[in-house]
Amino acid sequence: MDQNELKKLVGEEAVKFIEDGMTVGLGTGSTVKFMVDALGERVKNENLNIVGVPTSDRTAEQARSLGINVKSVDEVDHIDLTIDGADEISSDFQGIKGGGAAHLFEKIVATNSKKVMWIVDESKMVDHLGAFPLPLEVIPYGSKQVFKKLEKEGLHPEFRKNDAGEYVLTDSKNYVIDLHLGEIKHPHQLADYLIKQVGIVEQGLFLDMVNTVIVGRQNGPEVLTARP
């Protein structure tokens, strides 16, 4: 199976955990897209009654097009389960997210959820975090000063730009700075440092957060329990 087939596999496996009446956080990214497609099929074929809480404009648009009832995080009083992708997951189930520039909204939804599930193909499972650049969402005002400070700290920052050389904007119209770290030895310390920096709205380390991980492997989906 190629990578897309593995992503489709875990997306279809994940929706088996969604029950009638649930409020479900809908993540963002290529793997989640397959999951939302599969959820749309269940809504259509089984008349499944659920509320989806999307973490990006593009996920909201996809969900609505499939007939999924969509509400914002501020319109619901609870979220039973959030299903999202990840860019890296370490052996102790810590994660990096934000490759799709949605990590602020993703973290807001995840931290307000009873349970969090990540769905990934096997290439995302690593021993240590850091090979994937760590995304930061920063407000445009003063962003070059933030950049200079990160550079001075030896964190190898880079503004994320599109093919036209323009700054990539988040749904909140903020910039993204990626840190090219190679390996993150002390993720909790790094997260604490970054979030204290004025101008950084959120950072892409998702720590002590996930309950279940579904990994797409060549021999089928593997369901791992990270935390009760």
UniProtKB/Swiss-Prot annotation:
Reactions it catalyzes: aldehydo-D-ribose 5-phosphate = D-ribulose 5-phosphate
Keyword annotations from UniProtKB, A to Z: Isomerase
- Which residues of this UniProt protein bind substrate? T28, G29, S30, T31, D84, G85, A86, D87, K97, G98, G99, G100, K124
Q: Which CDD domains match?
A: RPI_A
Q: In the record, what terms sit under GO molecular function?
A: ribose-5-phosphate isomerase activity
Pfam families per the record? Rib_5-P_isom_A (PF06026)
**Can you tell me which residues form the catalytic site?**
E106
Q: Please list the GO biological process terms of this entry.
A: D-ribose metabolic process; pentose-phosphate shunt, non-oxidative branch
GO CC terms: cytosol
EC no. given is 5.3.1.6
**Pathway membership of this protein?**
Carbohydrate degradation; pentose phosphate pathway; D-ribose 5-phosphate from D-ribulose 5-phosphate (non-oxidative stage): step 1/1
Q: Which family does it belong to?
A: Belongs to the ribose 5-phosphate isomerase family.
Q: How does it assemble?
A: Homodimer.
Query: Which purpose does this protein serve, as stated in its record?
Result: Catalyzes the reversible conversion of ribose-5-phosphate to ribulose 5-phosphate.
Q: What is this protein called?
A: Ribose-5-phosphate isomerase A
Highest classification ranks of the organism: Bacteria, Bacillati, Bacillota, Bacilli, Lactobacillales
